Amino acid sequence: MHVLLADDQAGVRSALRFLLEQEPGIIVVGEAAEAETLLAQEMAIQPDLVLLDWELPGSQAADLLLALRLRYRRTMVIALSGRPEACQEALDAGVDAFVSKGEPPEHLLAAMYAFKRGGD
């Protein structure tokens, strides 16, 4: 599974990369700190999954999700946020899953593996 990380905080991206690099079959193929970079990388890389900070600078999250979907429909998007109220907003906008940044890493991995099982 090829994963693109999108979060404005370098520390969060580093922690996600470290976590995911421990998992067999998961390859981090790119990182973005803002919306414009995310869209450019998503178009070039065409990842299986985007881990999207729901508060990523440079665009409204729902608009950014729509742009991702219009460019490459096959990509799954899991929204991440430290705001619990963002969960329903993200799900209503059409993300495939939502994981709070405060949840244990196992929750993120479970959402990712559920996608992988469904995609096989």
Describe the role of every protein-language-model region.
Residues 63, 82-99, 103, 107-110:
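Alpha4 helix (beta4-alpha4-beta5 surface) of REC/receiver domains from two-component response regulators
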Residues 113-120:
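The C-terminal output helix
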Residues 34, 60-63:
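Acidic catalytic/metal-coordinating carboxylates
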Residues 7, 53-54:
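Active-site residues of response regulator receiver
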Residues 31-49:
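Acidic, metal-coordinating helix/loop segments flanking the phosphotransfer/catalytic sites
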Residues 62-73:
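Short amphipathic alpha-helix used as the core "switch/output" element in two-component signaling
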Residues 78-80:
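Hydrophobic/aromatic residues positioned on beta-strands within the core alpha/beta folds
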Residues 10-30:
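Two-component/phosphorelay signaling modules centered on CheY-like receiver
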